């Protein structure tokens, strides 16, 4: 028999300021990968993490 699909899924977090701000330290968009529990966190995740392109801590939002 096949195993049940897990509750944890892999998501990608992308910097909000990199997409909207063209005048930044270096070109590119900061992305992090992490896991989230589908049962506990049903809405999209937003975490403040360090962005090497902006050179500061910025909010990172979950993308598909």
From Swiss-Prot:
State the UniProt keywords alphabetically: Ribonucleoprotein, Ribosomal protein
Q: Which GO terms describe its cellular component?
A: cytoplasm; ribonucleoprotein complex; ribosome
Gene Ontology terms for molecular function? structural constituent of ribosome
One Pfam family name is Ribosomal_L33
- Which Gene Ontology terms describe the biological processes this protein takes part in? translation
Any signal peptide, and if so, which residues? none
At the top level, the lineage of the source is: Bacteria
Instruction: Describe the family membership recorded for this protein in Swiss-Prot or TrEMBL.
Output: Belongs to the bacterial ribosomal protein bL33 family.
NCBIfam families on file:
PRK00504.1, PRK00595.1, rpmG_bact
Q: What name does the UniProt record give this protein? A: Large ribosomal subunit protein bL33
Please tell me the species this chain comes from: Prochlorococcus marinus (strain MIT 9313)
Q: Which gene encodes it?
A: rpmG
């Amino acid at each position: 028999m096949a195993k049940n699909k897990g509750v944890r899924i892999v998501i990608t977090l992308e910097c909000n300021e990199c997409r909207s701000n063209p005048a930044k330290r270096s070109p590119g968009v900061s992305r992090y990968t992490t896991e989230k529990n589908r049962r506990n966190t049903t809405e999209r995740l937003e975490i403040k993490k360090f962005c090497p392109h902006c050179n500061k801590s910025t909010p990172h939002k979950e993308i598909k």
